[in-house]
């Protein structure tokens, strides 16, 4: 489950950058359980994360929520493997596209609203939206 859904009261989905949100706000440690939400009991030698994988995934998600463009682009490219989601062509030159436009609430918080589009498909989508 997307961690952002649990924290709707803290995250303004219309803002690209979540000012004032801290890692501890998004991932509190509760009752000796891993802060990432995996529900694993923390080993005695750990205070917040069950594993390094939990920590890394949480840091990446936090960077996405905070609007870190490099992390966002890296994760979208990794997920879509460099292929345009519309025409299927592979390119290292691509654009991250908001499926639901930012101005109607498709701004921040998760990768679910982003897709890779080749430059031609992105131009076509943008042109169609303006008409």
Regions found by a protein language model. Give the residues of each.
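Short cysteine-rich loop/turn motifs with clustered Cys
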Residues: 32-41, 68-95, 118-120
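Histidine-centered nuclease catalytic patch
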Residues: 88-116
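Short Cys/His-rich "knuckle" micro-motifs
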Residues: 42-48, 93-97, 126-130
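Active-site donor-binding loop signature of nucleotide-sugar glycosyltransferases
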Residues: 52, 101, 119
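BZIP DNA-binding basic region
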Residues: 1-16, 22-60
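Short, charged surface segments at domain edges that flank catalytic/cofactor-binding sites
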Residues: 14-30, 54-86, 106-108, 112
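Short Cys/His-centered divalent metal-binding micro-motifs
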Residues: 55, 92-93, 114-131
């Amino acid at each position: 489950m997307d961690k952002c859904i649990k924290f709707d009261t803290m995250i303004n989905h219309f803002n690209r950058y979540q000012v004032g949100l801290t890692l501890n706000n998004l991932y509190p440690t509760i009752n000796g359980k891993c802060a990432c939400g995996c529900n694993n009991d923390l080993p005695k030698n750990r205070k917040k994360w069950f594993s390094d994988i939990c920590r890394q995934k949480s840091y990446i998600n936090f960077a996405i929520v905070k609007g870190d463009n490099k992390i966002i682009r890296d994760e979208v490219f990794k997920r879509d493997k460099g292929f345009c989601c519309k025409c299927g062509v592979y390119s290292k030159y691509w654009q991250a596209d908001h499926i639901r436009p930012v101005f109607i609430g498709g701004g921040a918080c998760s990768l679910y609203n982003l897709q890779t589009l080749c430059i031609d498909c992105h131009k076509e989508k943008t042109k169609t939206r303006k008409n």
